[in-house]
UniProtKB/Swiss-Prot annotation:
It is found in: Secreted; Host cytoplasm, Host cytosol; Host endoplasmic reticulum lumen. Its EC number is 3.4.21.-. The E.coli strain this operon was isolated from causes hemolytic uremic syndrome (HUS) and also encodes Stx, a Shigella-type toxin. It comes from Escherichia coli. PANTHER family: CEREVISIN-RELATED (PTHR43806:SF11), PEPTIDASE S8 (PTHR43806). Injection of the inactive mutant protein (Ala instead of ser at position 272) in mice has no deleterious effects and elicits an antibody response, suggesting it could be used as a vaccine. Residues 1-21 form the signal peptide. One of its GO terms (biological process) is proteolysis. Keywords: Disulfide bond, Host cytoplasm, Host endoplasmic reticulum, Hydrolase, Plasmid, Protease, Secreted, Serine protease, Signal, Toxin, Virulence. Induction: Part of the subA-subB operon. Forms a complex with SubB with the stoichiometry SubA1:SubB5 (called SubAB5). InterPro entries: Peptidase_S8/S53_dom (IPR000209), Peptidase_S8/S53_dom_sf (IPR036852), Peptidase_S8_subtilisin-like (IPR050131). Its main location: secreted. This is Subtilase cytotoxin subunit A.
């Protein structure tokens, strides 16, 4: 039997009691403007799967529920208060993707499918959650095409299972996993296999699997302004992991305000937040063509990224998320709305 390994929680929390209505700093940094968002199709159903600690559909997420599932021993899809960090995490990530007010989500027209895998996940809960998405034949185009994993499973115990799963997902070419690389400031190239975090640890060797790689590995940037040269977020437990050929893209990951399950707000830093922001951009892109292949979406996201020589050793090609370019490039080439009914269910 394979052993469940404890998750890495990839952010630091600073709790705030008041809701914040202003646009977050990173909207300007990555070019997320009203003009950019006008290119998307808000009427096309887009569902992002948040594989995490459960989502509380409150506040700006009140109208964002698509479905909720549990892959935990208690069978509950709701956040539990065993750990403050775990209690908050899933809701926080969902809000960065899709919150409609209070906290501004990157793509507020997206719906969220919550798949709780921690705490107290069943055997290989992360893998089971992804398998359940891949095997769901009732999902329409654009539904759970983007899978946000701002955490993961550490170690080698399930590495072969992960590798088979992700290879199969790549061959299917219809879903993307957006995965956080981790937060201890380590050079991933120097880590042992035991220290790496799945699914970000997936590192295909063959040319076919590389071409079909369904994982987008995300590092976190320190706060910066548009026009400035960004640097990786560092220091403490939230310093971003890095490594050319092990990180696909970097995105804002410091001083990110999110929604908590108690309807208050918090501020966090780390690759968790950066990952959710990338997932939100991909959701916006998907609205323009929900039938697009995973390869098409990933290629556009990476090709449209800004490239900084100062980051080349830490992020492949020095890529930094540019939402304006990614959405514009994809949506001007693709505009095939698919209007489907909304499905909602709970396990």
């Amino acid at each position: 039997m394979l052993k469940i390994l404890w998750t890495y929680i990839l952010f630091l929390l600073f709790i705030s009691a008041s809701a914040r209505a202003e646009k977050p700093w990173y909207f300007d940094a990555i070019g997320l403007t009203e003009t950019t968002m006008s290119l998307t199709d808000k009427n096309t159903p887009v569902v992002v799967s948040v594989v995490d600690s459960g989502v509380a559909f409150i506040g700006g997420l009140s109208d964002s529920e698509f479905a909720k599932f549990s892959f935990t021993q208690d069978g509950s899809p709701f956040p539990v208060k065993k750990s403050e960090a775990l209690y908050i995490h899933g809701t926080a990530m969902a809000s960065l993707i899709a919150s409609r007010y209070g906290i501004y989500g990157v793509y507020p027209h997206a719906l969220i499918s919550s798949r709780r895998v921690i705490p107290d996940g069943v055997q290989d809960s992360w893998i089971r959650a992804i398998e359940s998405i891949m095997s769901n034949v009732f999902l329409a185009p654009g539904e759970e095409k983007i899978i946000n994993i701002s955490g993961g499973q550490k170690g080698v115990a399930s590495a072969s299972v992960w590798t088979e799963l992700l290879s199969r997902m790549g061959r299917n070419n219809d879903r993307l996993i957006v995965a956080a690389v981790g937060n201890d400031g380590a050079d991933i190239r120097k880590l042992s296999a035991q220290q790496r975090i799945w699914p970000a640890a997936y590192h295909p060797v063959s040319s076919v699997n590389k071409k079909q790689d369904p994982v987008i590995r995300v590092a976190a940037l320190a706060q910066y302004r548009k026009g400035e040269t960004p640097v990786l977020h560092g220091g403490g437990i939230t310093g971003s992991r890095f490594g050319n050929n092990w990180v696909d893209i970097a995105a804002p990951g410091q001083n990110i305000t999110f929604l908590r399950p108690d309807a208050k707000t918090g501020t966090g830093s780390g690759t968790s937040e950066a990952t959710a922001i990338v997932s939100g951009v991909l959701a916006a892109m998907t609205s323009c063509n929900p039938r697009a292949t995973a390869t098409e979406l990933k290629r556009t996201l990476l090709e449209s990224a800004d490239k900084y020589p100062s980051l080349v050793d830490k992020v492949t090609e020095g890529r930094v998320l540019n939402a304006e370019k990614a959405i514009s490039m994809f949506c001007k080439k693709n505009y095939i709305p698919v209007r489907q009914g909304r499905m909602s269910e709970e396990l």
